[in-house]
């Protein structure tokens, strides 16, 4: 086997000298793997929410066109990085082959079922056939292969829950795990996109961390997700609003917090133009955590400057130590969460 680079630079075709994620094209030839790679037989792609929403809109909801767009992305780039959003997703698959340099260094063995916890935007991918598209949960079943680099992180699918349930939670594992690090007892926390997958997990974790002296406010988009979040009972206040309309949302948060605003705002939406809502609803010394892949650095930075806000803004890193374990544990802890996730995603 050829010797590979830890970060997968050996797979970059164009431009040379960059890492696989920003590369325009990477090598997705799976006939031969490098000595530090893991070959995966792919079962399901879990497309990033912002990416899938964009593809679905471009395709007008037509499944055949969604498939064509996805195949075109992979054919052109050797990976699934949405050219509009720049985001990818992650995958579920079975370990097919392990490079010789990783023998004795990894706890994986051939036949293990895993979820990759690195983005599809940097993962060499070959799609042989698209078998099923589940638009409601952003998942696509395929026949195909993928490569996990030596630096790539993963989670073994646990024995105590269905694989699609675990995959759905692991897709957004960074959000609740980062919430656990950020939220302190007594904090007022606003979660934008609270009725979605990452939003529900964050609401549960935020309430656990903020405690009885804290307050969790959930902003949802649809009537359906609002009703669901109210029934879950994780939030002190839940309301439906258009997160792209900052003034209206600001007025509502002023009312709910008696003008104190949020200590922490966590943005989980999959649409653009919600930066100012996040910033305006957060107190001057507070924190805005942008987990959304639809976030614009320019809009957030210039927007905060434009309204004289001194908030600390954090780019949502999808990885934090122990994030997979933390997130799966939430589904074990909360029967309500597990029931909803099972109904929606499993």
Segments predicted by a language model, with ranges:
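C-terminal capping/lid region of NAD(P)-dependent oxidoreductase domains
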Residues: 259, 328-346
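Short amphipathic alpha-helix with an adjacent loop that forms part of the alpha/beta core around
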Residues: 246-260
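Glycine-rich phosphate-binding loop and adjacent beta-alpha segment
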Residues: 269-334
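Mid-domain Rossmann-like dinucleotide-binding core that forms the NAD(H)/NADP(H) cofactor-binding site
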Residues: 159-240
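A short N-terminal beta-strand-loop micro-motif at the entrance of redox/enzyme domains
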Residues: 14-52, 56
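Glycine-rich beta-strand-centered segment in the early N-terminal region that forms part
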Residues: 31-46, 58-120
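NAD(P)H dinucleotide-binding glycine-rich loop of Rossmann-like/cofactor-binding domains
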Residues: 89, 114-186
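Conserved "cap/hinge" positions at secondary-structure junctions
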Residues: 99, 118-119, 124, 193, ...
